[in-house]
Amino acid sequence: FCKAWLMDHGAENAFIDEAKNVIYEYNAENDVPVAIFMAHIDTVFPESVPLELTEKDGKWFCPAVGDDTANVALLMLMAAYVANEKPKTNGGIVFVMNSCEEGLGNLKGSRALNARYGKRIEQVISFDGYLDGIVGMAVGSLRYKVTVKTAGGHSFADFGNVNAIERLSAIITE
């Protein structure tokens, strides 16, 4: 949807990369420095959760509308404006509706952008959430995969043996 909408609104070179990011590059050819503006298109909700939009007193309500659908819509409008007005810029602008930001996505979309643009990136501005503030620093994420194997498990058949769930719970509380 995002790619088709961008193309219908003047951003003919919009594309989807291998990480499922929707990208529109403006004056970003060759090795020019770029500023990346992004908002994420994934949500924490599984596909089985209905995302029903309702309106009350002039406000929209829907799971994920604040994280991050509203920002995606604004970013798409900004990209369309730039595509049509063609402002003069000192470097490239990259508009990204990035994927795999939430949950198990492990920032796959952001990491793909870093791999694609690398040292050309002068700044990254991510529109995320709906709070009344600005975070002016990089935000990091560390992910760990922990495997715990024990002899115990079932509360009846393995009674008295160490239980993996209990051990994981102890790690979390520490």
What does each model-found stretch correspond to?
Residues 1-61, 81-84:
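Acidic/His- and Gly-rich active-site-bordering loop/insert found
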Residues 6, 24, 37-40, 75, ...:
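Buried hydrophobic positions in well-ordered alpha/beta secondary-structure cores of metabolic enzymes
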Residues 29-30, 50-53, 108-112, 138-141, ...:
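Short, glycine/charged-enriched secondary-structure capping and boundary segments
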Residues 40, 154-156:
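Histidine-centered active-site/metal-ligand motif
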Residues 42-55, 121, 136-147:
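Acidic-glycine-rich active-site phosphate/pyrophosphate-binding loop
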Residues 60, 64-143:
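Acidic/histidine-rich catalytic neighborhood of metal-dependent amide-processing enzymes
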Residues 156-174:
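Acidic-enriched catalytic cores of C-N bond-cleaving enzymes acting on peptides and small amides
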